[in-house]
Each structure stands twice: as C-alpha cells, then as structure tokens.
Amino acid sequence: MQINLLSIQKNNNDEFSKIDEHYTKLIKKFCSFNEICVFNNKINQAQNTNSIEAKKSYTNALNPYKKGFCIALDEKGKEFTSVEFAKLLQDKNEITFFIGGAYGFEQEFIAQMHTSIALSKMTLVHKFAKTMLLEQIYRAFCINTNHPYHK
C-alpha cells in the first residue's frame, strides 16, 4: 500500500514535527509513505489577497497529486470513529490525503475527491490536524492488523 499526504504548509521544524516524524516512522512499518508540503509564492500572494484566490491557489498546487483513493480533510466532511476510518483504508492500493491551507478547499476540489473527512466539529490548528491524522492512520493499521496499540 502507498499512502501520500499532501498539505498546504511551509516545512517547519517544531514540536509538531517531532511527533509527526514519530508517527511517520510507525506508519512506514505498514506501508510506503510519502509526505509533500506545498507552499509557493503563488499561494503566499493569494493568501494575502482573499479567500477565493487562496483556495484557487491550493487547488492549482494540489491537482497534480491526485492519485489513488483521494481523501480531503474538510470541516464539512464525514466524521469517523477510529474503527470506521480503519475500514475506509482497507483494501486500497494507494491513498492520497489532502490538507488544505488556512481557507480550506474550493467546493470543486472537494467534489473530485472519493470522500472528505472531518477530524472534529471543532476548528483545529493546521499542524495539529496533520498530527492527528498521522496518529489515526497509524491507529487504523493497528486496528486492521489486531495490533495492541488500539484497545
């Protein structure tokens, strides 16, 4: 299985990065994992213009990476229990997760996904959402392989 994680963000080396690295190592025991952080001048300029331009810039930056079973993180997406999320990931050859920028995604981008998920009804800081997703991906593998991490 191949899992791709695309996010609109600058590469940072902070406390979240250390936790993300930990879960990435654990995930790689179960599958091939590729993470790409996308942030370019067009995104930076668009975010300083307005939300519509920002969302367009996210779509343009992420469109080339749509491969396999595509899942966008979106506040209006479906909420899953950990067990339901594990079932969603089963029997897929390639899964690509998309985490948008500060303004979320264009509706057209969401419509092109196989599904969209919400990690919570609350708004989460971008970095925390990514960390939470990584932990849930690892937990899903543990559930699907009866690993004792998930009890």
Curated annotation (Swiss-Prot):
Reaction catalysed by this enzyme: pseudouridine(1915) in 23S rRNA + S-adenosyl-L-methionine = N(3)-methylpseudouridine(1915) in 23S rRNA + S-adenosyl-L-homocysteine + H(+)
EC number of the protein: 2.1.1.177
GO cellular component labels: cytoplasm
Record has S-adenosyl-L-methionine as a keyword: yes
Source superkingdom: Bacteria
Record key words, sorted: Cytoplasm, Methyltransferase, rRNA processing, S-adenosyl-L-methionine, Transferase
GO molecular function, one term: rRNA (pseudouridine-N3-)-methyltransferase activity
Alphabetized Pfam families for the sequence: SPOUT_MTase
Binding positions for S-adenosyl-L-methionine per the UniProt entry: L73, G100, L119, S120, K121, M122, T123, L124
Subcellular location(s) of the protein: Cytoplasm
PANTHER family, sorted: METHYLTRANSFERASE, RIBOSOMAL RNA LARGE SUBUNIT METHYLTRANSFERASE H
Alphabetized HAMAP family for the sequence: 23SrRNA_methyltr_H (MF_00658)
Function of the protein: Specifically methylates the pseudouridine at position 1915 (m3Psi1915) in 23S rRNA.
Subunit structure: Homodimer.
Protein name, entry field: Ribosomal RNA large subunit methyltransferase H
Taxonomic path: Bacteria, Pseudomonadati, Campylobacterota, Epsilonproteobacteria, Campylobacterales
Name of the gene this protein is made from: rlmH
